[in-house]
């Protein structure tokens, strides 16, 4: 009697990074099959949902801070609007992630059925973590709303591959944004610089989580106490400091991760220890990231076809 055929193994690859550097173009340039014949299925950004369903979220996200700076909105009003906008950016990703996670087996098995490769334009971490952190560092998003946002990050099933693309060359980044000329987009150099730094730090954060969770909570808490307070003086250092590649088998210093920006007196006791609820939230963030396989991909000077063939 013939044994029942196993379903094909699903390989998930998320392509993420700052906006305007050409992720969608890279996906378009990718073939539909691997050299071995495995199909490559592509899932693009839900741009129609973002821009055509009621409010144009891209325009609103850029206009709201300007309205606050112009006095048309209070800080509280601006924070609430930005939180709502970021939540709506995240909604399609969370919905699809929930559906996809139900199809992912916890264990990768060898089978005679060709693998299916699913290439996705962005992971939920973009709308829930990276863009809110960037807005927070720019003074456009409150710490309270940021904490509320990261609670929504879903637990990741094993087998997630995250490729973070960055473009440190600001001139090239600005040129790419201007050349596509999308309504409502702005080539704000400060935001682009901050967003690239946040994404580079995301890679360090995932690598830290890979070697810390789920068994090193006490060690993490001791490292936390040694972090300096994240005052305004550390902001420029966070954005501009070099980030040399560290071997993935080496434990990443905590101060290279995104968690360092949460060392704020609003979240801690006088001795720097996290208050219990925030400790749960940040440790929960690490446990949600620790199963992700991550790599950093600097696409400076590369064409989209060159990127797609690597």
Swiss-Prot record:
It comes from the Viruses. Its EC number is 2.7.1.21. InterPro entries: Herpes_TK (IPR001889), P-loop_NTPase (IPR027417). It is an enzyme of class 2 (transferase). It holds the Pfam family Herpes_TK. This is Thymidine kinase. Substrate binds at residues 86, 182. The active site is at residue 45. Belongs to the herpesviridae thymidine kinase family. One of its GO terms (biological process) is TMP biosynthetic process. Homodimer. ATP binds at residues 17-24, 176. One of its GO terms (molecular function) is ATP binding. Catalyzes the transfer of the gamma-phospho group of ATP to thymidine to generate dTMP in the salvage pathway of pyrimidine synthesis. The dTMP serves as a substrate for DNA polymerase during viral DNA replication. Allows the virus to be reactivated and to grow in non-proliferative cells lacking a high concentration of phosphorylated nucleic acid precursors. It catalyses: thymidine + ATP = dTMP + ADP + H(+). Keywords: ATP-binding, DNA synthesis, Early protein, Kinase, Nucleotide-binding, Transferase.
